C-alpha cells in the first residue's frame, strides 16, 4: 500500500464505564464518526481504517467514511489489550509500506482537521519517533493530596510546601487521542512511550478525558464551542 497517511481508529464494542461509548450519540453523530469526519477533510489521509470487533460499529464506520474495516481478533478486543498490538495487527492486515505514516486516532478524539494536520506535520519532521498527543495538568502534582485513615487528608509530599505554584514545573499527561509514527516504528516497538517521544500539545478542550458518564456532557459542550460553532 503506497499512500501518504493511513489513519487507524481502534474501536471496541465493549466499554466498561460508558456502555457502547464508541456508538453513543455525540452532538448528533455517533462518537466514532467524529474522527472519521476529521480525517475525510484532510487530503493526505487517503486510507481511513477502523479496527473493530463489533458489527454495529463496522456499519457506522462505513457510513461515516471508513475505507476499510478490519475484523479485530478476540484476543485484541479485551479490556487489557494494548494499543500498539492492535495497530500492528492492522498494519499487517493492510500490508502497509514501512515508510508510510500511520496515525492511531481514538474514537473519542474530537479534534479539528487542523489539529490532526499539525500532528501529521510534526511526525514528518521526526520520522524515527512517535508523536504523542499530550495535555497539560492544570494542578501541580507537588500539591497532590492523599487520604489518611478516618476522615483526614494530607499533602502527599511536603517537599514543596512553601513553593509558589507558579514556580513549580508544568506537568503533562498522555491525552490518549492520537499517536503517529512510520509503520516501521510501530512494528519495532512494544508501546508508544517506552522511549522518548515527540509531544503534540493539545489545547485543554481537546485533551478532555471521556472515561466516566459525567465526562460526556462536558466534552459535548467543549466540542460545540471549539469545533462546531467555530467552523
Predicted features along the sequence, with ranges:
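Hydrophobic targeting segments
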Residues: 4-9, 32, 47-50
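Short active-site oxyanion
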Residues: 44-49, 130, 205-206
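A short, N-terminal amphipathic alpha-helix
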Residues: 31-47, 59-64
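Conserved SAM-binding loop
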Residues: 24-25, 50, 103, 208
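Short phosphate-binding loop-to-helix
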Residues: 49, 56-102, 110-111, 118
Amino acid at each position: 500500500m503506497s499512500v501518504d497517511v493511513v489513519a487507524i481508529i481502534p474501536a471496541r464494542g465493549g466499554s466498561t464505564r460508558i456502555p457502547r461509548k464508541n456508538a453513543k450519540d455525540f452532538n448528533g453523530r455517533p462518537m466514532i464518526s467524529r474522527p472519521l469526519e476529521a480525517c475525510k477533510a484532510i487530503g493526505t489521509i487517503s486510507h481511513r481504517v477502523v479496527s473493530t470487533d463489533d458489527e454495529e460499529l463496522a456499519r457506522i464506520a462505513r457510513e461515516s467514511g471508513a475505507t476499510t474495516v478490519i475484523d479485530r481478533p478476540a484476543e485484541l478486543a479485551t479490556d487489557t489489550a494494548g494499543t500498539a498490538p492492535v495497530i500492528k495487527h492492522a498494519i499487517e492486515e493492510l500490508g502497509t509500506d514501512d515508510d508510510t505514516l500511520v496515525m492511531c486516532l481514538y474514537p473519542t478524539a474530537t479534534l479539528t482537521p487542523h489539529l490532526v494536520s499539525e500532528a501529521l506535520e510534526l511526525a514528518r519532521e521526526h520520522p524515527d519517533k512517535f508523536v504523542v498527543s499530550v495535555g497539560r495538568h492544570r494542578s501541580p502534582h507537588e500539591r497532590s493530596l492523599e487520604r489518611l485513615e478516618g476522615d483526614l487528608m494530607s499533602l502527599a509530599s511536603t517537599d514543596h510546601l512553601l513553593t509558589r505554584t507558579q514556580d513549580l514545573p508544568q506537568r503533562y499527561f498522555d491525552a490518549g487521542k492520537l499517536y503517529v509514527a512510520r509503520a516501521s516504528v510501530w512494528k519495532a516497538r512494544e508501546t508508544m512511550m517506552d522511549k522518548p517521544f515527540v509531544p503534540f500539545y493539545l489545547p485543554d478542550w481537546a485533551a478532555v478525558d471521556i472515561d466516566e458518564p459525567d465526562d460526556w456532557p462536558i466534552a459535548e459542550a467543549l466540542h460545540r464551542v471549539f469545533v462546531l460553532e467555530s467552523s
